[in-house]
Each structure stands twice: as structure tokens, then as C-alpha cells.
Amino acid sequence: MNSTDLLDLEKHTPMMRQYLTMKAAHPDMLLFYRMGDFYELFYDDAKRASEMLSISLTARGKSGGDPIPMAGIPYHAVEGYLAKLVQLGQSVAICEQIGDPATAKGPVERKVVRVVTPGTLTDEALLQERQDNLLAAVYQGKVGYGFATLDVASGRFVIAELPSREALEAELQRTSPAELLYSEDFGDMGLINHIRGKRRRPEWEFDYDTCIKMLLEQFGTRDLRGFGIADARLSLQAAGCLMQYVKDTQRTALPHINSIVRFNQGDSIILDAATRRNLELTVSLSGSRENTLASVLDNTVTAMGSRMLQRWIHQPLRCHDTIRGRQQAVQELLETGLYEDLRAELKALGDIERILARLALRSARPRDFARLRDALGILPLIRERLQRCDARHLKSLNILLGDFPEEYELLCRAIVDNPPVLIRDGGVIREGYDSELDEWRKLSDGGIDYLEQMELREKERTGIATLKVGFNRVHGYYIEVSRAQSALVPIAYQRRQTLKNTERYITPELKEYEEKVLSSQGKALALEKQLWEELFDLILPKLQELQDFALAASELDVLANFADRADLFNYHCPELSDTTGILIEAGRHPVVERVSQSPFIPNPVELSNHRRMLIVTGPNMGGKSTYMRQVALITLMAHIGSFVPAERALIGPVDRIFTRIGASDDLASGRSTFMVEMTETANILHNATANSLVLMDEIGRGTSTYDGMSLAWSAAEYLAQKLGAMTLFATHYFELTQLPEMLPGVHNVHLDAIEHDDTIAFMHAVQEGAASKSYGLQVAALAGVPANVIKAAKHKLLQLESRDHGVDMSKQQALPLTMTPEPSAAELRLEAIDPNDLSPRQALELLFELKRLL
């Protein structure tokens, strides 16, 4: 249906006019329109939903002369369909019936009561438990970008001023927003096209003055200087648009969003998008969450702890004091064994971070309050354990945990032990919490005694032995008599329902009692809902302190998890130095050692002011890439406060980690593998410093031999001489092994292999010096390349090596490289013989025969 039809409402039925008016207010969303027990979708919404949800597309009569495409879903199954839609990046407006159909003249009154978008989820059923769900906004300035993210499910609000396209790309990969807001004139769509939940917003929503006003209203302040963000103009424009969007979609106060933090790149080790991808921090190269650094490190016992750990992994710190604080906490938890008891207690806390967000939005359910109550009950035990700790950071966290005896006592009095899922039907408020509620409940529940007495009385009065007094939700209270005795009922009995073998009646007395009970039930439920709403008002004043409790508990979970990993995997505490360099003894790759079927071979690395670059050579499949990645991962782990898989690690200042490892075509941008490789290389050469860790793997593979070797040589020379970056430079160009003779601070190391006949055994051990050969043909044979191809390759290798050494191969040199020489008669004869079948005499005769064939 086009926009002209939407505006011409008079030709539609009253119900469709109501629908189209609401749809016009939410043009970019699917509108779930409540009709009885179903949510219906019409026109284009129905077609889209039918395709995305695999539901039937039908038609509902005509309106305006045309059939109306329609699709519907049952209201009781809506959460499952919503989850699928938000995963696809769709937003949904939910329109409910708020009027009474019995009294309505025309269409029942309806209202959009809830808006669900991928980036503003707070409902437990729709969220990924162990992943942040971020709403982001980006604003492009003349120079640089403003970027803001908000986790509505926790209240965490962060902004960043990003100087370049590369910095924005890295932030998008780090945060992986579920929904991204961008302005109408955003000029770099190639950066954001891959994000499913993109939302284009009008330019006025990014107006600076409008945005500042929006933020000041939210935080209740006169200016933003107290947050240290007053000069972050571009990111404040992004933040203001984001805040406007959240208010529009949530349609309620947002008290849990009470601060905003500026992310400064200088506070953490900078990881560009390629590095995050190549190191497989939280997502593997295949897109899985298995076999990643996070999958090995994460044994946290709470979902909020898991989310914090992933944020730490993507944001390794540079401040040594903060890192040492974490290390000392982990060390004490490990040495005392306290981490085991602490983890058992933390596990009982649940996901209070998200519970508090739902509390702030007043969308919390009864079981959320019960979980919060249980968490507050565990808190004194956790604090008591931490009282015995000496580590300064553990003491600070213990203070941040806080005390909430009054809130705990309130929730214990107010909420039943095992409340129902919803407040809708009551049964949530505990008996004894409110005397008036108890009285109404007693009246509505105490009818059991009354009905039993009435049943006995009526049996005596009528002499009907089969008489029963009962109740059902459809017909209310009734007196039931078997059909055989129905002739005995008094004249005052009024027939209410006829069944196969019984008759049901109502009497004036029973009718009066029914009205009284139903009235008391309604009043009890109304009062219970009122008391429920008051609970929010009683808890919310402590929201900030409760959020601090959740934050401290999350960090305790991560630190106890680090102690658990160190104990289980034999990790050691790394030392931090103010002198540039990385020294690792017996280092191991944290992921490969966990998934490998064979024992992992530990390896050392030494980078210092006098040993800035290692040229890494060795056989393909020998472990060069694994070795380089393990150095980067150990360095990163040390900077998040974790212990590391090494006997010893001494690590100096690191400002960035770069990786140029592997590449594939970027088809979306029309870039070849070689172009991707060179773009990543250019980024490293422009941005690396003397404190950067650089991993360069096989530069120059995507072009001709001499072009590739020249580029690799020049890049290595630039890194070593101009930048002085700490570099591991793996290459298959053996000419580069001459660099140590020409440049100070450059050294050769290699991964060894042992060759036996036509087979090869990889030793995976790093040794000083250059490798002697690459063993490419042996690796090809292991990969299953046909034997005749390997044989031809060996011949061609000899031919090329002889040519390089100036050997006159005359006829053979005339052969094109794509040709394989025919085997000689002697070779053919030898291939046809099994030596085990020859007698001594036959063997002697064969020798003479072969001599003649040469």
C-alpha cells in the first residue's frame, strides 16, 4: 500500500482507519495489532513477516476496494517471534486493546504500549545472556567521527571521539552494536552496511544544542563538565540522538542511565579491526564463539561477569597500576583458595545488572524481585569473606558492594518464596505484608468453608443426595444435581446449565455470594497491583548503590575466574616493566594448547631495545603463525590482569598490537586479497610506534615473486629502522634472513622440522638462526597432492635451483615451466619391478639391462 492510500483514510473501514493511523506513526517498524487472541499484521508488514517468520500469508476481506494481505501470530507465543525478528535487525511496535469490547462503539480503543528494537532490549527472553546488547549512534564531522554506545539493559553509556575511518571500524568491531543510528547525510555507508539494525535518523536529531539539552535533562545537571566530556562535540551529538531514540522507544523514565563515560584510546592498548579478527578474541575466523580466547578464559559464574570479561578482552589496559591491582587480587584469591567459595556464592547472585535495568524501567517481573532479594541475602556472606583479604583492590570492591539490610528485609516481607511469572493474576505479595490485602483475600478464599456448609444445608433441605456446590471460570458458582434427581429441586432454583448427566442451578443466595466473592477478588487483585507498583518506588532510591553492587560483583566474578583459570591451566603472573620489551619463557598458545590432541611445545620470545625484530622462518605448517599469535595473546592477557600461559613473562609498555596475518578477498568492497594485505600493511607502517607489537605474516604473497620480496624487504626495513617497533616478521622469502647482517636489532629465529626420506616431522620448537628450507613439497605431499604432481614438482625445483646457480641445463632450460619431461625408459622399467620378486641372478641381469637403457 502506497503513501497516498495511507493518507486517504476515508475509503477504509473504521478498524482499518485505526490501524493505518497507528502504522503511519511507526512507518519503519512492523506493527503488531492486537485482535482477540492474535497479533495481526497487514499489507507490506504481513508480507515481510510471512517471509521472515515462515507464517501463512492470507487476506482479510477488502478495505478501500482492495484485498488486505494479512498474517497473524498467537499472543501467547509473541516472545519467540519477537526474538527471531530482533535477531534479523527488525523493530516492532506492539499495539494492544486498552478499551472494553463490550462497551466500545466502533473499533475497540487501542494504543502502542511497547516498542521493541534490536538495540533497546531489556526483556530476559530476548537478550543473549552472556553478550552485551548495544545501541550505538555515529555522527560524521568534517574531521573524524563521534561515536556513542548505550546498553539499555545495564545503563552503561560511553562516548568516543574517533579521528579516522580505521578507528571507527575498530570501534564497530569491538562493540558489535545490535542497532546503529546514523544521520541522513552520513557519507561512509561502506563502513556500516554490514550492520543489520541500521536506522537512518533525521539531521535535526544530531543538532548540537538539541543534543546537549537532551543529555542535561537526562542527567539532571546544568552542564556536562562534571563528566569530563564538555569538549567531545561530535560524540555528544551522537549521544544526544541516541538518548532521544531511547526515550521515544521506551516511553518511560530512564533513571538507571545516570552517567556517561568518555572512552579515551590512550587509556587502553589500541587494537584495530584486523587485529581483533586475526587474534580471534571473542569470535573465530569462521564466525563461531568456540575456540576463541574468550572461550578459554571465560568460566565466570554469572552472565554479567562474562560480559565484563569480554569487554576487558577487547579493551586491554595500559595503566600498570590498575593491572597490578587486579593481579594482586587474583594472586590472593588463588593462594588462599578463596576463589572457590567466592565463585559458589557469586553464582547465586544471578544477573542483577539486567534485573536492575528492568527495575528502573518498571518492567521487572515478580521473579526479578525474588532474584534481587536472594542476591541481597547472599551479599553479607560475600562481604564477610572479603573482610579477610589484604589485597587493596579486593578491599575497594568490598566497599563498593555496599549494604542493603532494609531492602532485603522489605523484599523478604513483600514477595512470596516462588512468585508467578506475571503480576497479572496476583499471588505475588506475601501474606502478612498488608492487612487490607489479607482481609480481601480471606473473603475471596474463605468461601470454601461457606460453600461446604451451604452444600450440607441444601442436601438436608432438599433431600437430594447427589447435590454439589461448585465453581468454574465460565459460569461462576452453581448447584449441581444429577438429572435423575432434578425433579426434586426447589422452585427457587434457576437452571443455569444443562450437561449430559447433570443439571446446574443458581439461587439468589448463591448469586449474592458470587457477586461478593468476585468483588473481593477484584479488589484484592487491584490492591496487590498497587502494592506491587509501590515496591518499585521503595527500591528505586537505592538504584545507584545497587548498580555499584552489580558492578563490583561482576568484577569479583572475573577476578575469581582468573584465579580458577590460573589454577587449572598452570598460568603464571606476568611481570610488568617500564622498559620497552617482551620476554616470555616457555610461552604457550592459550587456545591451541586446549584444543590440540598432542602436547603443546612451549616456546620463548625475547624482544628488547637491542632485539627489536625477529625474522621468523621455517616450514609451512611448522607453527609460525601460532607462535606469533601466542606472543600477542600472552601480551594482551597480561594487560587485562589475567595470569598467562608461560613459565615467566616480563612485559614492558605496549600502546598498540597490530597483526597482518592471512587475508581473503573483500568482495563487498571490490578489493583483492593482495589489496587487503597492502591496506593492512599501510595501516601498520603509518601508525606503529616503538612501543607497538607488530605481527607480520608472509607479506607479499599475492603478487609476483620479486614484487612480493621487494615489498616484504622494504616493510621489514622500515619497521626496524624507521619505527623501531617490536616485530615478529614471518616470511617464506629466505632472502630476508640476510637482514640481521645489515640492520642492528634484527635477529633470525626458525621453527625446525626433521626430514626423513619423503616425509617430514614438525618439531614446533623455536630456535635461533634461519631455517634451511621451507619443506613446501613435503607439506604438499602431507596434504594429499598426487604423487606424480609431487614428482614433477621435485624435478622442476631442481631445474629452477640449478638455473639460479648458473648451471647449464641447455635442453631442460628450454622447457616451459608448465611442462613435465617424459620419464626415461630406465625409469619406466624400474617402476615396473618389485625387488622382492627378483632372484640374485635376475637382479644381476636387470642391472645389465638398465645399463643398456641409459
Swiss-Prot record:
NCBIfam families with a match to the protein in the record: mutS1, PRK05399.1
Role of this protein: This protein is involved in the repair of mismatches in DNA. It is possible that it carries out the mismatch recognition step. This protein has a weak ATPase activity.
Source species, domain of life: Bacteria
Family: Belongs to the DNA mismatch repair MutS family.
This protein's encoding gene: mutS
Protein name in UniProt: DNA mismatch repair protein MutS
Binding site for ATP: 618-625
Keyword flag Iron: no
Alphabetized InterPro entries for the sequence: DNA_mismatch_repair_MutS, DNA_mismatch_repair_MutS-lik_N, DNA_mismatch_repair_MutS/MSH, DNA_mismatch_repair_MutS_C, DNA_mismatch_repair_MutS_clamp, DNA_mismatch_repair_MutS_core, DNA_mismatch_repair_MutS_N, DNA_mismatch_repair_MutS_sf
MF terms (GO), sorted A to Z: ATP binding; ATP-dependent DNA damage sensor activity; damaged DNA binding; mismatched DNA binding
Record key words, sorted: ATP-binding, DNA damage, DNA repair, DNA-binding, Nucleotide-binding
CDD domains: ABC_MutS1
Pfam family, one: MutS_III
Gene Ontology BP terms: mismatch repair
One Gene Ontology CC term in the entry: cytosol
Keyword check for GTP-binding: no
